[in-house]
């Protein structure tokens, strides 16, 4: 199974491995990946969680607390940590989510849904406590993406590009934030 990951998804996996190694954890777990996803500044995971009505900061704090509680080895180890069974199951589920959504690359949204959908794992338990299910996350994806599909490695940066780089003049007019422009000095020629 050849998986193609977006740049942000690759970064999250790399950060998860580095985090596990730095903490002396023997395995990279769903907790490490979820923490890496939530720490991404330009990522969409926090927006996805917010769309479900949950508090991404609170969930992130609970994930970090759970990470601290993981067993760690002391001393210097030169081997990098292995992926846990839960992480492998979550990544497999993420690939299924990618295919189900008609996308070409595994993105950070797929990873988060994969983690929550591949319960039981510590992250899924935290999300369940906050009433966030895989179905709720799936329903939030179109809103966060603005209807876009993941067709390139940099797809997450392109979501809602129109909203990022333009001004909705109609919305500004409704809010009374536009100055009315009068064209009464112009006369149209009549024949």
Regions found by a protein language model. Name each.
Residues 187-191:
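Short "domain-exit" segments at the C-terminal end of structured domains
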Residues 1-186:
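Histone-fold recognition with a strong bias for associated Lys/Arg-rich disordered tails
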């Amino acid at each position: 199974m050849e998986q193609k990951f977006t740049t942000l998804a690759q970064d999250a996996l790399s950060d998860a491995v580095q985090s596990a190694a730095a903490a002396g954890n023997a395995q990279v777990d769903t907790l490490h990946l979820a923490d890496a996803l939530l720490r991404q500044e330009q990522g969409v995971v926090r927006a996805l969680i917010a769309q479900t009505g949950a508090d991404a900061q609170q969930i992130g704090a609970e994930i970090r607390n759970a990470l601290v509680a993981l067993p760690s080895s002391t001393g210097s180890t030169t081997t990098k940590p292995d992926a846990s069974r839960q992480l492998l199951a979550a990544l497999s589920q993420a690939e299924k989510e990618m295919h189900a959504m008609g996308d070409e690359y595994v993105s950070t949204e797929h990873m988060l849904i994969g983690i929550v959908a591949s319960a039981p794992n510590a992250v899924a338990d935290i999300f369940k406590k906050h009433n966030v299910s895989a179905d709720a996350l799936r329903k939030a994806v179109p809103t966060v993406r603005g209807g876009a599909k993941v067709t390139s490695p940099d797809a997450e940066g392109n979501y809602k590009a129109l909203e990022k780089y333009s001004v909705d003049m109609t919305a500004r007019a409704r809010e009374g934030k536009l100055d009315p422009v009068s064209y009464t000095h112009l006369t149209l020629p009549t024949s």
